[in-house]
């Protein structure tokens, strides 16, 4: 007895989505589950049938093989890869009926056949942005090599002025059935590849493929706050599908260029602010850059090199909304260089006036005491 068509078993169309297949399976599984139908052999067999159908149709690779070759494509020894056109292993329906099937339909498949409709490939584009562009948002123009729908035939693959016709091999059903003795085998039509239509006069521009290779320019809106690693999906902007299939998607991968002043960590910005040792000692107010203009940074007297000061709200606003991050300014005290004689003498007088008082340089004196104890303990 021939196996029932898997789509028919689940009560769904051949173009049903994964969600529709799952919904149909759950409904039928609840209805025919053996626990709900004890001692009901018919319900048990029905449950096994829908389980087998779901196992195949819920797996993308198996579903593709089934759509191409029917039950033989997913039986024992069948090649599981989508687009695989052979069978491996021991005897199966493909081995039994393969030659007979090809004798009947093989010649017709080579004349006026139609390519199977395939979804276009997804594309990826790496987009380099400046930090300013990433923080403020921008519109970027990109140019990508891709397949686009053939304008001459509008993606149908048929010669302009003509249209695909009903497949004479399967009568537009997309499936053909072979009977050999007690066995019946249903196969995807080898001439129209399951579409039910064929292109009798292919388009000369795209050679019946329904798409051509060219460059495409797009304007991509970049939202404020994007960061390296963020990905923007442009639905339907990937490669055009083959033979009228749906297009793929374009994924724009964001990469932020290095900045001469700022570094970024999440929503926070970091920068180094060099100050003179006099300004660090006396304290004061400094002008520091932000991505929105100048800002005032107050540093207290006695500021040490490496201290970090926070300017709230001067960082990056999150891409999904919310309060802006902070700008963290690391003070780097700069030692003066290229001193003239007068300047050197002034510094020497300044050093003498300090009189090595602990209160002026507590860390230095603490370090000296630590070194002294170290040498005493080591008995150098």
Curated annotation (Swiss-Prot):
Zn(2+) 1 binds at residues 150, 153, 203, 206. It holds the Pfam family DnaJ. The keyword Coiled coil does not apply. It is found in: Cytoplasm. A zinc finger (CR-type) spans 137-215. Zn(2+) 2 binds at residues 167, 170, 189, 192. One of its GO terms (cellular component) is cytoplasm. GO terms for biological process: chaperone cofactor-dependent protein refolding; DNA replication; protein refolding; response to heat. Binds 2 Zn(2+) ions per monomer. Homodimer. Belongs to the DnaJ family. The J domain is necessary and sufficient to stimulate DnaK ATPase activity. Zinc center 1 plays an important role in the autonomous, DnaK-independent chaperone activity of DnaJ. Zinc center 2 is essential for interaction with DnaK and for DnaJ activity. This is Chaperone protein DnaJ. It comes from Nitrosococcus oceani (strain ATCC 19707 / BCRC 17464 / JCM 30415 / NCIMB 11848 / C-107). The lineage of its organism: Bacteria, Pseudomonadati, Pseudomonadota, Gammaproteobacteria, Chromatiales.
């Amino acid at each position: 007895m021939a196996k029932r068509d898997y789509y028919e078993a689940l009560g769904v169309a051949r173009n049903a989505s994964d969600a529709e297949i799952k919904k149909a399976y759950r409904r039928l599984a609840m209805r025919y589950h053996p626990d709900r139908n004890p001692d009901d052999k018919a319900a048990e067999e029905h449950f096994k049938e829908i389980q087998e159908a779901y196992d195949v149709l819920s797996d993308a690779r198996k579903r593709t093989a089934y759509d191409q070759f029917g039950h033989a494509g997913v039986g024992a020894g069948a090649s599981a890869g989508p687009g695989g056109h052979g069978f491996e292993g021991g005897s199966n329906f493909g081995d039994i009926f393969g030659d007979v099937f090809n004798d009947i339909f093989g010649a017709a498949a080579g004349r006026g056949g139609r390519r199977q409709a395939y979804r276009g490939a997804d594309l990826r584009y790496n987009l380099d942005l400046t930090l300013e562009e990433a923080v403020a948002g921008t519109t970027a123009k990109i140019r990508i090599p891709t397949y686009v729908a053939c304008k001459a035939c509008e993606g149908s693959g048929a010669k302009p002025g003509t249209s695909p016709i009903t497949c004479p091999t399967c009568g537009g059903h997309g499936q053909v059935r072979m009977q050999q003795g007690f066995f019946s085998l249903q196969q995807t039509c080898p001439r129209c590849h399951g579409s039910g239509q064929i292109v009798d006069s292919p388009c000369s521009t795209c050679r019946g493929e329904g798409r051509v290779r060219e460059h495409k320019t797009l304007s991509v809106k970049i939202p404020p706050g994007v960061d390296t690693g963020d990905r923007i999906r442009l639905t339907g902007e990937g490669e055009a599908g083959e033979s009228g299939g749906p297009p793929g998607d374009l994924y724009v991968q964001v990469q932020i260029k290095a900045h001469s002043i700022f570094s970024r960590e999440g929503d926070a910005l970091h920068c180094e602010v060099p100050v003179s040792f006099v300004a660090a000692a006396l304290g004061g107010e400094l002008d520091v850059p932000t991505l929105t203009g100048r800002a005032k940074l107050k540093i207290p007297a006695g500021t040490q090199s490496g201290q970090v000061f926070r300017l709230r709200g001067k960082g990056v606003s999150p891409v999904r909304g919310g309060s802006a991050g902070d700008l963290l300014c690391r003070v780097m005290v700069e030692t003066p260089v290229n001193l003239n004689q007068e300047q050197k003498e002034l510094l020497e007088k300044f050093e003498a006036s300090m009189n090595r008082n602990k209160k002026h340089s507590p860390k230095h004196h603490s370090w000296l005491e630590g070194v002294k104890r170290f040498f005493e303990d080591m008995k150098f």
